[in-house]
Amino acid sequence: MEWAVDTALHAVDAAPLELSGLAAVAAPDHGHIAFVPHPSVGLVAANYPVDAIWRAVLSQDEAAMTAIDLAAGPVWLMVERNASGVEAFRLPEPEWRFMSELCASRSLQEAIDAAPEIDAASVLAGHLAAGRFIRFGLRSELIQVVN
């Protein structure tokens, strides 16, 4: 968690993806689209409520620390820097799997396959609107750019 927070805090600024470019992608290629996440976006999966621990420690809230239930089960978090600062929030586990695939620049189809139970179009639209991606391309093109 701390690594993701530090990464978000010190990530370079980057303009969010210009969504109009997505409209130019031919329908047969939609499943091959891959995204590049904003440099401040990170994903954390933990067996304990590390987000609650982080907040309690940051606010030096002994009552909140005492109230944390370590047996509450796993958490799936997204960490990002936005206009308000660094934020960490929970995602449903299937959405986290979907975003984990997308943030690894895997294809949209691979992300859908990793979380078939979600409404991928709605989830993707929400994350695009929030500016969590900065670039896209067909997966084969992105692999060449990154390597």
Language-model segment annotations:
Residues 1-26, 84, 89-147:
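Long, charge-rich, low-complexity alpha-helical segments
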Residues 1-86, 90:
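Hydrophobic packing positions characteristic
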